[in-house]
A protein has these predicted regions:
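Acidic-basic catalytic patches of nuclease active cores, encompassing PD-(D/E)XK
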Residues: 1-61, 179-187, 193-195
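Mg2+/Mn2+-dependent nuclease catalytic core
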Residues: 88-108
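Alpha-helix termini
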Residues: 73-75, 109-118
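Short, surface-exposed coil-to-beta transition loops
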Residues: 63-66
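Domain-level recognition of nuclease-like catalytic cores that cleave nucleotide substrates
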Residues: 116-195
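Conserved catalytic cores of phosphodiester-cleaving nucleases, focusing on short active-site segments
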Residues: 68-70, 79-87, 104
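Active-site nucleophile-His-acid catalytic modules used for acyl/amide transfer and hydrolysis
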Residues: 83-92, 117-121
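Short, flexible beta-strand-to-coil junctions
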Residues: 72-76, 130-132
Length: 195
């Protein structure tokens, strides 16, 4: 499958979509949360980098986008990994992050189609932060975000997805949520090893 993808990489600007192996680095450049998430793998990957002026796909209604994503290829097929880096994670931040995951998912899906990837084995969302302000609800944002609208089962802030560790994405996709905590001192990197 990776060979077919390689034959299509020329369709992309190498700054935004390229092949990677060994270490995959996703970087947050905003000064208040500047950090990196580093993934280690021996499998072939294609990385999708985000621009600070998201979205990468101009026609999307969802204008927000996560910091990066990558496709990991193994014998089963293509696995999509979506990565967002934050500093303090409050409920309001989490609601924004859900939108960023959705925007990057749709962008990555468009990239996948151009790479001749028509099916994803699994989608995983990663969120790395320095401080969890969601688990302790007294430290979180407005209580309004903890309430569900009348007749609905989901809260305004998406608290239930945080608790369950599942992110609902467009087109009926569901992704496992992996939470990581980065050090407060430089280089503030979260390192994950992928099999």
């Amino acid at each position: 499958m990776i060979d077919r993808c390689r034959s299509c990489l020329h369709l992309f600007n190498k700054h935004w979509v390229s092949e990677a192996s060994g270490s995959i680095v996703v970087t947050e450049t905003a000064s208040d949360g500047a950090s990196q998430a580093v993934f280690k793998t021996d499998k072939p990957c294609v990385i999708v980098k985000a621009d600070k002026n998201a979205p990468l796909l101009w026609a999307l209604a969802q204008r927000k986008c996560a910091d990066g994503a990558f496709f990991l290829f193994d014998k089963d097929g293509a696995h999509l990994h979506i990565v967002e880096l934050k500093s303090k994670i409050r409920l309001a931040t989490w609601a924004l992050t859900l939108n960023q995951f959705q925007g990057m998912f749709l962008t990555a899906l468009a990239v996948a189609r151009l790479l001749q990837v028509h099916e994803l084995v699994r989608v995983t969302c990663y969120l790395a932060g320095t401080e969890d302000r969601i688990t302790n609800e007294s430290e979180s944002a407005s209580p309004t975000l903890l309430k569900a609208p009348v007749g609905m089962t989901k809260t305004f802030g998406g608290h239930e997805s945080w608790d369950k560790g599942v992110v609902e994405l467009p087109l009926s996709f569901k992704a496992a949520l992996v939470k990581g905590w980065k050090a407060r001192a430089p280089p503030r990197a979260t390192i994950l090893i992928l099999a």
